[in-house]
């Protein structure tokens, strides 16, 4: 891809989708600059790798750039975007730049409403264990790599494909994984589930004729689109008819044990015993997707099993922050703290089920910050149902993510609905800054505290650890 444009500037370089692309381009030898509203571990890492990172957005930041990259989170009136257009500098959407990266290698793209980051990470890990040395660009920090991107020397690039803004339709992979299809980011699809499903069909149709669609057989919406996918299909899941099928699934603390049965065209392959270093049935499905890809690419069974057994996880995906002391005033003892990115009811239910499976005899305390008023409105009853499944709930105000407040779709409304449902008496903490102390005031010996959300609540586990 090396050509006359040598200097590429990223507006919002600290974002999960932007930073990985920037890092790969840095390693390809490009001059990378970028800006973000605040310094973070991500911006510091990129600066340490050689990027010039500015805090704050100003027109001067784009000086010398041959192109600037933006995400859908960057508004058109951003001063850097305005300056670039005035200077005739190409403004490139993030997904287009990712598509350009994928042209350098054979692309494996992971799409789906839930589980993309973990599945992408698992696929990258099993390919690495099979000595395929993949490049990867992931929406979360792969713990074993210490980063969310890496430039490998192998022929494959594994990427997370974003359906939230339909930008995954810019990608041209040779393998496409669809983990599930759920009603989220529906503003993009005119609140029409049929349009959402059509987008996923189009995603698979962008595969070449020799490509492969790897589809989850356990998801009803994915099953609905299968008749319209005209590329070779490999299915995976716990369903009896899946080509790559998990059987005899057992939880063992925070690990899952299961056997994989596989079909290679009409031939049955030997069973594969897996011990997955992640909890929950949803992660069994994510691992089965990785097994399906690895099997198709010829990764040895021993390498697949080793990669899944030693998988160290992804940042903020059921991350065990540690064991912390309960204040003496509350009887002492210890509690377990889990950090998780989940913000949709389906994701939340899966994470809570994983916590129950890992610690069946302990109280599960959920500290949750809703993300976006529109999602809270659209999924309100589902949020009430899922929140009611925890043993105790601490609830904050909605993280707006730039949206204006909506009547009856805020944190207080959720708290009221939980009380009316009678399942639970939530503790409402209006300011998320007060949540770390609220957790310590509430927790008791043996509790498992799951801190969950996609907004500013991400800082809470670290603050709880400092206060404990």
From Swiss-Prot:
InterPro entries: Mur-like_cat_sf, Mur_ligase_C, Mur_ligase_C_dom_sf, Mur_ligase_cen, Mur_ligase_N, MurCDEF_pg_biosynth, UDP-N-AcMur_Ala_ligase_MurC
Localization annotation: Cytoplasm
GO biological process, one term: peptidoglycan biosynthetic process
Pathway assigned to this chain's UniProt record: Cell wall biogenesis; peptidoglycan biosynthesis
GO cellular component term, pick one: cytoplasm
EC class (word): ligase
Catalytic function, reaction form: UDP-N-acetyl-alpha-D-muramate + L-alanine + ATP = UDP-N-acetyl-alpha-D-muramoyl-L-alanine + ADP + phosphate + H(+)
Function per UniProt: Cell wall formation.
Official protein name in the record: UDP-N-acetylmuramate--L-alanine ligase
Organism this protein belongs to: Bordetella petrii (strain ATCC BAA-461 / DSM 12804 / CCUG 43448)
